Each structure stands twice: as C-alpha cells, then as structure tokens.
C-alpha cells in the first residue's frame, strides 16, 4: 500500500535531519500524526518561527534574532580573544563549560572536499574583518579533531599567523573523570603528548 502524498512529504522532510533514515522518519511521522498532534503543531510553529525570525549575528555569524547576538553585545567579554568554531552548537558547548570569556566566530562548517565545502564557503572575508579589527590579539581555534577539522585548523592558523596574530589551538586529551582503561588509544596518546607541568 502506498502512503498518501502528504504523509510521504512529511517522511521525506524528516529524513533531512542528521541520523534519520527512512524507517526512523516514518516512525516519527506516525508518532506525530497518531499520538502527538499537539506536539506536531508545536514543532511546526517553532520551526516556522525559527525560519522567519533567526538570522546571523553581524559579527560572529551565529544564529541571532537581533543584529548582534547576546555574546557580541556583551561589553564585559574580552575583546582581545577570538575563538573560531565550526557550528553554533560548538559555541554553545564552550559557553556551557564556562571556560572562555572572549568572543567567537562561527564558520558554519569546515573544509570538506567530499562535501564540496572549501574555504570560500566558510565566511572567511567576514572572519578576517572581525579578526583584524585592531582589538583581537589571539585567535583560539576550536575546530573538531576530525580530518576535516584539522585541515580547517591548519588553513586558519596559516591565514592568521601570516597576519601577525597569535594563534592557539584547543588541546586534546583525557576527558574529566575518564579512566585510562576506557579511553581510546588516540586520545590517550594525545593526552601524553600535550602534557603540561604541574
């Protein structure tokens, strides 16, 4: 039996979410339509509101409802440090960790030749204008420790070093509360290589 076109359209729309395949999308669609119509309506309204009201912060490129996001508008933040992250979710993780009190720039991606994403797709003109505003003295690169994140980090470090800025990279290592026995070998090796004096 073939699904009605409206149901097929909903299933197809749900498949655009990361990690959602055809079966999961179908289960989600049936759940929303059968058991949670209020939830489905709430989801539709929230998505519509986000699509119409969210834009990109003029300075850091993260999502914002205003010209400047709350972080860029906060005058108490350090203006001499600029942390570069791949995605808005990365910025939020750093903020939740309360480990950085400078400003950010969100690339909205990373260099990934397999996905046809190159440097031109990472808002580098906007990033350069931000980094070279005369206030920033240190660039903190906080891209992910994947092959794509490493390539992006290398490209960014070269870009800023040749412009005379100090460039640092977040360290890799043992998770807090992690036990050596359960940590993967790459993480353990990196933690040993990047050890610090005590």
Curated annotation (Swiss-Prot):
Q: Keywords of this protein's UniProt record, alphabetized?
A: DNA damage, DNA recombination, DNA repair, Metal-binding, Zinc, Zinc-finger
Q: Which Gene3D superfamilies match?
A: 3.40.1360.10, 6.10.250.240, RecR Domain 1
Could you confirm whether the keyword Transport appears in this record?
no
Keyword Magnesium included in the entry's annotation: no
Q: Which GO terms describe its molecular function?
A: DNA binding; zinc ion binding
Q: Which SUPFAM superfamilies match?
A: Recombination protein RecR
Q: Which Pfam families match?
A: RecR_C, RecR_HhH, RecR_ZnF, Toprim_4
- Top-rank taxon of the source lineage equals Bacteria
Which positions fall inside the Toprim domain? 80-175
Q: Where are the zinc fingers (C4-type)?
A: 57-72
Q: Which InterPro entries match?
A: DNA_Rcmb_RecR (IPR000093), Rcmb_RecR (IPR023627), Rcmb_RecR_Znf (IPR015967), TOPRIM_dom (IPR006171), TOPRIM_RecR (IPR034137)
GO terms for biological process? Answer: DNA recombination; DNA repair
Q: Which family does it belong to?
A: Belongs to the RecR family.
Q: Which NCBIfam families match?
A: recR (TIGR00615)
Task: Name the job this protein performs.
Answer: May play a role in DNA repair. It seems to be involved in an RecBC-independent recombinational process of DNA repair. It may act with RecF and RecO.
Q: Which PANTHER family match?
A: RECOMBINATION PROTEIN RECR
Name this polypeptide is given: Recombination protein RecR
Provide the species name: Chromobacterium violaceum (strain ATCC 12472 / DSM 30191 / JCM 1249 / CCUG 213 / NBRC 12614 / NCIMB 9131 / NCTC 9757 / MK)
């Amino acid at each position: 039996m073939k699904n009605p076109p409206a149901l097929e359209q909903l299933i197809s729309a749900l498949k655009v979410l990361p990690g959602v395949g055809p079966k999961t999308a179908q289960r989600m669609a049936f759940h929303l339509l059968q058991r949670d119509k209020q939830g489905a309506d709430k989801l539709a309204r929230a998505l519509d509101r986000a699509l119409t009201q969210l834009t990109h912060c003029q300075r850091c490129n993260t999502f914002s409802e205003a010209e400047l996001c709350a972080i860029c508008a906060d005058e108490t933040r350090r203006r001499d440090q600029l942390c570069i992250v791949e995605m808005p979710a990365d910025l939020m993780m750093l903020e939740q960790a309360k480990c950085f009190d400078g400003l950010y720039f969100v690339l909205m991606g990373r260099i990934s030749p397999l996905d046809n994403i190159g440097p031109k797709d990472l808002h580098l003109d906007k990033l350069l204008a931000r980094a070279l505003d005369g206030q920033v003295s240190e660039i903190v690169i906080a891209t992910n420790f994947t092959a794509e994140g490493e390539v992006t980090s290398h490209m960014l470090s070269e870009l800023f070093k040749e412009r005379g800025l100090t460039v640092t990279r977040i360290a890799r290592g043992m998770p807090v509360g992690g036990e050596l026995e359960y940590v993967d070998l790459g993480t353990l090796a990196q933690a040993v290589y990047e050890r610090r004096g005590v």
